[in-house]
């Protein structure tokens, strides 16, 4: 499982590296250069596509759209200068509590 987690770490590292690339040559740099609204719109779009795939019970499409969603979430985090550790720390703080909501 840890090698799978490392994939997420490498994804964010790649996004960080590409954030300074030429936006005409890097999709990641293009998204980041277009501002927070574009990043937010892409997360919204990919979340909706993931939900639609789930409604259709299309397992392969759920996996595909989930990967897109995770990528775009990472780009959004970068746009707001967040690191995966910020999110992991929040999740860790919720461990062992009733429900997922931090009250």
For the regions a language model picked out, list residue spans one by one.
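Flexible "arm" and connector segments at domain edges
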Residues: 1-66, 70-103
């Amino acid at each position: 499982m840890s090698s799978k987690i490392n994939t997420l770490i490498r994804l964010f590292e790649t996004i960080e590296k590409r954030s300074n690339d030429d936006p005409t040559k890097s999709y990641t740099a293009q998204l980041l250069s277009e501002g927070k609204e574009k990043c937010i719109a892409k997360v919204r779009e990919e979340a909706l596509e993931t939900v639609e795939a789930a409604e259709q019970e299309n397992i392969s499409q759920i996996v595909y759209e989930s990967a897109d969603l995770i990528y775009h979430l990472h780009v959004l985090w970068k746009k707001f200068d967040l690191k995966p550790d910020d999110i992991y720390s929040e999740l860790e703080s919720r461990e062992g509590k009733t429900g997922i909501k931090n009250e």
